[in-house]
Amino acid sequence: MPRLTSIVRLCLATLLLALVGCASTSGGNPLDPFEATNRKIDAFNESVDQAVLKPVAKSYQDYTPNLLQTTVKNFFGNLRDVWSVVNNGLQLKPKETAETGARVVVNSTIGLYGLIDVGTHIGLQRHTADFGQTLGYWGMPAGPYVVIPLLGPSTARDTAALLVDRHGDPWSQINPVASRNQGVALRLVDKRAQFLGMDDRLNEVALDKYSFVRDAYLQKRRAEVRRGPPSDVDELEEK
């Protein structure tokens, strides 16, 4: 299995070529000028999900003991908290930095390397943050909406931040590479399993699933960035 960074770079290169190929395309939504290409990539991602990822995630959910699923979720959540501490610090948020940092310390020690989420039980709230959010906090506009092959919804800003997020993930430092990739696959399957229950509901409420997911993603990212002080981050959205 290739290294995660190689996969991400391939996805980004594919996305760039696709967008360059339709650079003159004018979409109906100003936030989604590459909608025609994005829809094709989204359809490809959906086919991969239905053929591979969803069945594997369903088997994982059905046959893996709930306790083991919980420990997997807790372990990778604790790793994500490490990078959140860094980004909350970069956003000059002392409360969020301290509280998330305390979660990491407690869960990594008393919680046995994050397998047990002690932090939540003692009232330490999780404040998730990534580098795309940090860029937005400091005023970088989101840019156009894009769909990345195999990775899904994003924006120009979040795509630019993706490699930084990948390198900032503590799991990216794990060696040997085979063990690292096994963990990446397990985290992906576990994350997909957590959203299995949403599939039917999404199909029921969304007349156009692509538009629904796009609008929900953009709204979520705006809300996450707006946790900080006002900036021109929403300049594109407000036009």
Which role does the model predict for each range below?
Residues V72-F75:
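Beta-rich strand-turn-strand
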Residues Y63-T70:
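Active-site flanking loop/helix segments enriched in acidic
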Residues N29-S59, G77:
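Post-signal peptide N-terminal segment of mature Sec-exported envelope proteins
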Residues M1-L12:
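Bacterial N-terminal signal peptides that target proteins for export
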Residues N78-A156:
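Mid-length scaffold segments of soluble, non-membrane domains
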